[in-house]
Amino acid sequence: MRRFTMLASLLMVLCLQMAAQTWEDVKVGTSTRKTLTYVPKNVEKSPALVISLHGMNQDPGYQQNQTQWNALADTEGLIVTYPLGNNRMWDTHGMGDVMFVEAVMKDMELKHHVDKNRIYLSGFSMGSW
């Protein structure tokens, strides 16, 4: 039993030292949208933020794997978030997704204390529209 307790304690410590990746809810007007956020274990006190938008018919997981922003986050101590477009697309004709990205920025400032002077937007295909 003692070995099990020691092993469980060691696993807990190792898990706490690992980077955190979570789905976060972002309020946009009366609706709630999702963004996949990666926070490295060595995050700065007031980190930079990269917002990375996926292409049409893709999702945040795909965008994350293709861009490798998380590796840069691990090296530089910044935060990366991958918003999810409605129906895996972005609104190219209205302002809905502009408001979503603005809400993501404000949400990241509140939750993760990102430096609002170091927020960067990146996208692929329809996500770079």
Give the predicted meaning of each segment.
Residues 1-8:
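Bacterial N-terminal signal peptides that target proteins for export
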Residues 3, 16-49, 61, 95-96, ...:
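A domain-start/cap signature at the N-terminus of enzymes
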Residues 8-15:
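Bacterial N-terminal signal peptides
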Residues 14, 29-31, 74, 108, ...:
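Short, structurally constrained coil/turn elements
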Residues 35, 39, 54-60, 76, ...:
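Sec/Tat-exported extracytoplasmic proteins
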Residues 43-90:
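Short substrate-entry loop that stabilizes the transition state in hydrolases
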Residues 93-116:
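Alpha/beta-hydrolase active-site loop
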Residues 113-125:
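Alpha/beta-hydrolase fold nucleophile elbow
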